[in-house]
A protein has these predicted regions:
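A small/polar (G/S/T-enriched), proline-flanked helix-loop surface module common
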Residues: 13-162
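C-terminal motif of bacterial Sec signal peptides marking the signal peptidase cleavage site
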Residues: 6-10
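Sec-dependent N-terminal signal peptides
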Residues: 1-2
């Protein structure tokens, strides 16, 4: 996985040092995760279900408060992510994500539906930010960068990519 180097801001606030290098059993780049989390040092991944070959769900919390919800499914039927987002009330201002053929970025939400291995079934990655959409809309680019970085590694961990 490529590591993105990010400089410390002028304020000297580099919270990426407090972020573990794995979230939900998936190796991540802390610098891509940092903008999505509130300030705080106590970053924890709390599995909501045991990671299995076809399903994983966890919550990333900071200071005991949920910040991100990450859910992965494999072995799913494919569907159009943008059509799904337009039909679901949870997606605010959905648009096609860059760099992933069937993915949507919205205010505080990302979903991607991609092939799972060589079979006809699909992998679904669904990420929700636990913050008001008015705040999350300013973090769309950061959420998209995190999610597109997480996606291929998550697919390997869940068994879609060998």
């Amino acid at each position: 996985m490529a590591v993105l180097a990010v400089g410390v801001s002028a304020c000297g606030n580099d919270k990426s040092n407090a972020i573990p290098e794995q979230l939900c059993g998936v190796a991540i780049t802390p610098e891509l995760t940092a903008p999505l989390l509130p300030d705080g040092d106590d970053v924890k991944t709390e599995p909501q279900s045991p990671r299995k070959d076809e399903y994983a769900q966890c919550t990333v919390s900071v200071g005991g408060k949920a910040a991100l919800y990450i859910v992965e499914y494999s072995g799913q039927n494919s569907f159009d992510a943008l059509e799904h987002a337009r039909d679901a009330s949870a997606f605010r201002n959905p648009q096609k994500a860059k760099g992933v053929t069937n993915a949507v970025i919205a205010d505080g939400k990302f979903i991607a539906v991609t092939p799972c291995g060589e079979g006809k079934k699909s992998h679904v990655l669904d990420i929700d930010m636990n913050m008001p959409s008015s705040e999350a809309m300013d973090l769309r680019d950061e959420l998209e960068r995190f999610a597109t970085s997480y996606l291929p590694v998550g697919k390997k961990v869940i068994g879609c990519e060998k």
